[in-house]
Swiss-Prot record:
GO CC entries: cytoplasm
Keyword field: Cytoplasm, Endonuclease, Hydrolase, Magnesium, Metal-binding, Nuclease
SUPFAM superfamilies reported for this sequence: Ribonuclease H-like
Name of the protein this chain belongs to: Ribonuclease H
Residues binding Mg(2+) 2: D10, D134
Compositional bias segments (type: Basic and acidic residues): 145-159
Record field: catalytic activity: Endonucleolytic cleavage to 5'-phosphomonoester
Coiled-coil features, chain-numbered ranges: none
Organism: Proteus mirabilis (strain HI4320)
Length: 159
């Protein structure tokens, strides 16, 4: 039987694009772990995605997961849109390329071995764990330590 894990995630960006960070809480029985990291230049959607990715990648074994996010972009993307994107070689219905494809591919791989139920909560509405993740993400964004190479590469492609 797989371990039952709760994951809560949030991303933050001070400007969009701008310095950003993610925050995640992983809970298994009475154990809780927090994850956060800040990036010099990124977007809010990239941080929302990265929060879920890093949390899932932190799990050593296949788990049964309830993942709660305040990002419809992440929830809809992974539960609905990704199937069509993959069929169209990572293009949207209008033939334009999917944004953040590096992270969508990474998230797609991260979910493979888990059974995940995706939940959405309204951000800044008093959901305790979401508020804590928001605080972690904002603090990380205010003290960035890493480059978001995927974001930087996507910007170079535009020039």
């Amino acid at each position: 039987m797989h371990k039952q894990v709760e994951i809560f995630t949030d991303g933050s960006c001070l400007g969009n694009p701008g310095p950003g960070g993610y925050g995640a809480i992983l809970r298994y029985q009475q154990h809780e772990k927090t994850l956060s990291e800040g990036f010099f230049m990124t977007t809010n959607n990239r941080m929302e995605l990265l929060a879920a990715i890093v949390a899932l990648e932190a799990l050593k074994f296949p788990c049964k997961i309830t993942l709660t996010t305040d990002s419809q972009y992440v929830r809809q993307g992974i539960t609905k849109w990704i199937h069509s994107w993959k069929k169209r070689q990572w293009r949207k219905a209008d033939k334009s390329p999917v944004l953040n494809v590096d992270l969508w591919k990474r998230l797609d791989k991260a979910i493979e071995r888990h059974e995940i139920e995706w939940h959405w909560v309204k951000g800044h509405a008093g959901h305790d764990e979401n508020e804590r993740c928001d605080e972690l993400a904002k603090a990380a964004a205010q003290s960035p330590t890493k480059e978001d190479t995927g974001y930087l590469e996507s910007q170079q492609d535009k020039t």
